[in-house]
Amino acid sequence: MAEHTEETNLLQPTSRFQLLKDILGLYPAIDGEKHKSTLGTAGWLRAGVLGANDAIVSVAASNSQGQVLIAALAALFAGALSMAVGEYVSVASQKDMEDADLEKERWELENNPEGELEELSLLYQERGVDPVTATEVARQLMAKDALQAHAIEELGIRDFSQARPFAAGMVSFAMFITFGCIPLLVGAWIPYRWYAIGAITGVSLILLAISGAVGAFFGGANMLLGAFRVTYGGALAMAITIGVGFLSETLNISDMSYRDE
């Protein structure tokens, strides 16, 4: 009977704050295991994987040799710059929206602190916390860092200063150039067309698998599934791109030229 009572007590929260932690899922590590969130790596990881995959697919599908090699090299740098600028604009836009939300929240905290306290308390109550406990916890969190408390619970912004547009753009550019050079060099050193196509395709599929596995590893996901997903998607994109290229060659689109005035 004593053992049953002790076990029951262990399952009960020791304080109202502990109750809130249980409801929010803030459990301690089990058996000394340290849990590390992978959310902080999402920005640069996405930029790197996108840059690498786009480079592999774009360059591998170019089937470059001779003069086409020069065009592929130009396309490599054009694609890298395009990826870098696109990633920069995307992350910068996200950061601007987050900054605007934080500035609005900062103004509300300065001009209506009691209203913000009630708002935070209601958020906890909606998740199952009783009003007294919710108000107590909201008050304690706001006393420590009111802006952070509201940013996390109300705006869903957990990583302050994590959005780095310039860094994301540079990572995307570097990964595009690095991974794009590999199939480009393979195509440059093999003079026979079909051998080159086979070699470029094989190397590109391997690179796609590596890219997917590495991305899954840093993201804490299944590496095999990540490798398969990226390889399958990249192979499909390459097949479509090469198919369009062969269709263009069949229709002699490359022989078309602008007329002189």
Swiss-Prot record:
It is a multi-pass membrane protein. Fe cation 2 binds at residues 105, 116, 119. Induction: Down-regulated under low iron conditions. The keyword Transmembrane applies. GO terms for cellular component: vacuolar membrane. The chain crosses the membrane at residues 66-86, 170-190, 197-217, 233-253. One of its GO terms (biological process) is intracellular manganese ion homeostasis. It catalyses: Fe(2+)(in) = Fe(2+)(out). GO terms for molecular function: manganese ion transmembrane transporter activity; metal ion binding. Belongs to the CCC1 family. Vacuolar iron transporter involved in the transfer of iron ions from the cytosol to the vacuole for intracellular iron storage. This is Vacuolar iron transporter. It comes from Acanthamoeba castellanii (strain ATCC 30010 / Neff). The gene is VIT.
